[in-house]
A protein has these predicted regions:
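Iron-sulfur cluster-binding electron-transfer modules in prokaryotic oxidoreductases
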Residues: 1-143
Length: 143
C-alpha cells in the first residue's frame, strides 16, 4: 500500500533490493539441499513473485515453492487472534515440506514466517538470512 501512496520515493521490498542493487556485488555459493520459499500476497500484487524465487535459486541447490499454498492466511497480525485462518490456509503445507526434505523456509514477511513455521514443522525466516549465508562480497564488484 505504501508504494501506491508515495509517488516520488521508490520503496524496495528486501528481495527486490538485493536483486536490484546487491546481486552483482555478491559471490553466490549455493547451499546443498532443498529450501522452501513462500511468496507473500504483497509480492504477488507488486509483480515480484519471480524475484524471491530467483534469488533463492542463486542460494540453494533446490527451491521448493509449494503449489498447494497461496496466501498463508496470517493477514498481517490477524493470525495472532484468528489462528484458525492460518491453519486452514496452510493445511497442505506440511506434507509438501516433509515429502521434499526441506529443512528451512524463506519468505519476506515476519508475520507470514511465524505462521509458516508453526504449520510446516521447519523454521521460516527472511530471505535475507539465506542470502547472507550463501554469499561473500565480490573482490571487484564492477568487474
Amino acid at each position: 500500500r505504501m508504494r501506491e501512496k508515495i509517488g516520488r520515493m521508490k520503496l524496495y521490498e528486501p528481495a527486490e533490493f538485493i536483486w536490484t542493487f546487491l546481486r552483482d556485488r555478491l559471490e553466490f555459493r549455493p547451499q546443498p539441499g532443498p529450501v522452501a520459499v513462500h511468496v507473500t500476497c504483497s509480492m504477488r500484487r507488486m509483480g515480484l513473485a519471480g524475484v524471491i524465487v530467483s534469488l533463492a535459486r542463486l542460494c540453494a541447490d533446490e527451491v521448493v515453492v509449494p503449489e498447494e499454498v497461496g496466501c498463508c492466511g496470517f493477514a498481517g497480525d490477524r493470525g495472532f487472534t484468528h489462528p484458525e485462518v492460518n491453519a486452514w490456509a496452510l493445511r497442505k503445507l506440511r506434507p509438501v515440506i516433509e515429502r521434499s526434505g526441506v529443512k528451512a523456509g524463506y519468505s519476506n514477511s515476519r508475520t507470514c514466517e511465524i505462521g509458516l513455521s508453526a504449520r510446516s514443522g521447519v523454521p521460516y525466516v527472511s530471505i535475507v538470512y539465506l542470502v547472507d549465508a550463501c554469499t561473500t562480497p565480490k573482490e571487484n564488484p564492477g568487474a
